[in-house]
A protein has these predicted regions:
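Catalytic cores of nucleotide-sugar-dependent glycosyltransferases that transfer UDP/GDP/TDP-activated
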Residues: 1-213
């Protein structure tokens, strides 16, 4: 398949601003390339993919970042800045996707989900967060009712944040183990880095810490 990926509109890949989406995108690209798929990635200027993903074609877009929904109130309205990075990435992605099989959206935002109902090009979404916004939650419910196979989540507990999702498609976060060094020791602290949210599995991390003493 020819797949076009839309990156997060919050910082360029490699900046760290996009949080776990950066790792997820690179891991996903690695897996898809290994399966023989053709991959285009639409991302903010200055973005970099892992060297192992050099077969993917990277397209740069400029514009103003979106405000993260993690930093807004649950009932905040949708805002799109002038010279929107998200809108520019979607415009670029949709143009390339005219000759592709599917457009895969990695951003948790209103506009790409809304466009699923309004363009002929298939748009799929990996929802990376729990329910952070009333307006996005309601839109996902509306689009999911028509296109249930166009949404995937990272875990069952995360999908449970959306009560209308009965049989979620789960795409776990894969890790390229070559990028990590195994520490064969039980001494020293176990560090936890992550947002306090159900899908992060903080309870599991605490359980492991307790088991290790």
């Amino acid at each position: 398949m020819h797949i076009v990926l839309i990156s997060t509109p919050i910082g360029f890949l490699g900046s760290g601003k996009g949080g776990g989406v950066e790792l997820t995108l690179n891991s996903l690209v690695s897996g898809l390339l290994s399966l023989g798929h053709s991959i285009d990635v639409i991302a903010p200027r200055n973005s970099k993919l892992y060297k192992s993903n050099e077969k993917a074609k990277l397209h740069f877009v400029e514009g103003e970042d979106q405000i993260s929904w993690q930093h807004q109130n649950y009932n905040s309205p949708v805002t799109i800045p002038d010279n929107s990075l998200l809108a520019a990435m979607l415009e670029k992605g949709l143009d390339i996707a005219k000759k592709a099989d599917v457009l895969l959206n990695m951003s948790y935002d209103w506009l790409p989900i809304w466009m699923t109902l309004n363009v002929e090009i298939p748009i799929a979404h990996i929802i990376s967060m729990g329910s952070e916004s009333s307006v996005i939650n309601n839109l996902i419910s509306k689009v999911y009712a028509k296109y249930p196979d166009n949404f995937a989540f990272h875990s069952k507990i995360q999908a449970d944040d959306y009560p209308f999702i009965k049989k979620p498609i789960i795409i776990g976060n894969g890790f390229k183990l070559d990028n990590y060094t195994f520490q064969d020791t039980v001494k020293g602290p176990l560090a936890w880095v992550g947002r306090v949210a159900p899908e992060k599995g903080l309870e599991d991390a605490v359980f492991v810490a307790n088991e290790l003493g």
